[in-house]
């Protein structure tokens, strides 16, 4: 569902994309990478994504990235495993949203559904927060400058009317 969400948004905006194998480690040919819900990944792959951004790449990552290794063993460190500095965030809580909207810093909003992480910004700039009485201090969408590149993090599954402008503006 997450891959389809992103692919449909790119398609509607007439943005071509390649599907890249999880065995790939050299992403230098790409202007930007979109990594949807990469729940299980080796440390080697996560390190390659970190290097890609550090060397000037632009990464769009979604919730649940780097949660487990390739054998599905859950990482017990701060999430997202090995990508916290690159993304400029961390989280240790997630929940199922019920009637929760996110609000961007420029006044747009969208309804969340199915998944939301309670993201804390370390070096990232929050682009959207949850419009919720108890979860409003957590970021839903962030952007981080990291060495020579940048990373956009989508910490929730939300409606398309916000996804497309975020992808295009990034």
Which residues make up each language-model segment?
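A conserved amphipathic helix/loop scaffold
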Residues: 28, 36-170
